[in-house]
Amino acid sequence: MLSIVLAIVAVVVDQVTKWLVATRMALHSEIEIIPGFFSLQYVHNTGAAFGMLRNGRWFFVAVAALAVAGILYYLRQPESRHPLLRVALGLVMGGAVGNMIDRIATGRVVDFLLFYWRDYYFPNFNVADICVTVGVGLLFLHLVLVERKGTA
């Protein structure tokens, strides 16, 4: 249940933040939040993370759907009971669904978080991307700290 609740919260926060950006900012506009470091910049992304594999709409929808189906199946297994694992899978699932909604509805994802330092700009991303990244990091942590000790 923890994974499902966390996934739902992630999807809601992701979709609300994207809606706020899309309805209050012009495409490609930027609002500097921390000068020289962080801005909100509204862009569309038809690819994956960092703009890779542009125009792969249905490929990414299929990958996200398969990932969600796999996670839902795994969550029914006894070995998925560890809380850290459930949090990790909930975040990954929520992020996958958040971006999948955009891809199905519009064929692109709204990205708006932009970090930069001098001439280096990290690619724009969104809340769903954060959820997937943190979820995968927690999954790795679970594998290293829990699975290796055999305490899952």
From Swiss-Prot:
Q: In which pathway does it act?
A: Protein modification; lipoprotein biosynthesis (signal peptide cleavage)
PROSITE patterns assigned to the protein according to its UniProt record, in alphabetical order: SPASE_II
Enzyme Commission numbers on file: 3.4.23.36
Q: Which GO terms describe its molecular function?
A: aspartic-type endopeptidase activity
Q: Offer a single GO CC term for the protein.
A: plasma membrane
Q: Which residues form the active site?
A: 111, 129
Record InterPro entries: Peptidase_A8
Catalytic activity reported: Release of signal peptides from bacterial membrane prolipoproteins. Hydrolyzes -Xaa-Yaa-Zaa-|-(S,diacylglyceryl)Cys-, in which Xaa is hydrophobic (preferably Leu), and Yaa (Ala or Ser) and Zaa (Gly or Ala) have small, neutral side chains
Q: Which residues form the signal peptide?
A: none
Where are the bilayer-spanning segments?
55-75, 87-107, 125-145
Q: Which family does it belong to?
A: Belongs to the peptidase A8 family.
**HAMAP family under this entry?**
LspA (MF_00161)
Protein name (database record): Lipoprotein signal peptidase
